[in-house]
Amino acid sequence: MTGLNQRVNELQAEMKALGLDGFIVTNPSNLLYLSQFDGLDGDGCLVITPQQVTLITDARYQEALEASLPKTVNLEITRDYYDVAHQVLADRGYQRVGFETSASYALYRKLAALFGDKLVPETGVIEKLREVKDTNEVAILRRSTQLASKGFEALMSYAKVGVTERQVSNWLNNWMLEHGAQKPSFDTIVASGFRSALPHGSATDKQLAEGEVVTVDFGYYVDGYTSDVTRTFALGDPGAELRKVYATVHEAQERMFQVIKPGANGQQVDSAGRDYIADEGYGKYYNHGSGHGIGLDIHEGPNFGPRWRSNVITENNVMTVEP
């Protein structure tokens, strides 16, 4: 549990910098990150203080948690998660308690009733820590992405003229689950022909046709971490114009790869691809971002886009690059 202790220590350091003497964690991915227990699904919360860590949940998870939690984490079993969280912090004479602004409004009202004006909204504190992956996280993400690549290679034997987009999506889903993936991180996108221009084109009953390009965008969890892979291929000869579009996007991606390094920001990475695509005459069609971090969630930081100058790349970020 060395990784767990380091993560908690990093959060406690951030709390000190923010002047917080407590932090209530409710976001499911952040709970998993800080507890390393993949089973709560949002049922409970973590209370972090400078001196201790308390996991509050109910009896459904008690046996599994008692067998896996390190001794440094206190376990409280109750259905009144937030009343107990308040008591844990009250015992320590809290003054400023952070909570995640991603919490629902109903949860915010509950916390506000308990903590009053001592409740401090904080955005992205834990998410920022999650952007920098440790060695184990990088290894898992590599396995996750390698499995996705194998899945796409296998799909090529099935994705033929006459098969529908939905059938392609279902085939890939079955293959991924049968070969070790836990679940998809989003509904697999299969968009063929004119629909391949849609950034988020859900699979339909449209049949794949000769001469069309097909875009497949998918991600699957392995050991809690998700891949995010987009591949485009042609059925037969798509024609000169589509070959040019494909080559343009590929070159844009290569130019973005050259920019990505510690210290570069999301706007710089985006511009490396976006400017090239515009120079080739396709700029007006570039209506989406250029990439993002991946990890416990399909969308994490850092982000690549015209508005993301503040997102600076650091060592051990893991990112998609998708112009």
Report residues per predicted region:
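Active-site neighborhoods and metal-handling regions in enzymes and metal-associated proteins
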Residues: 1-323
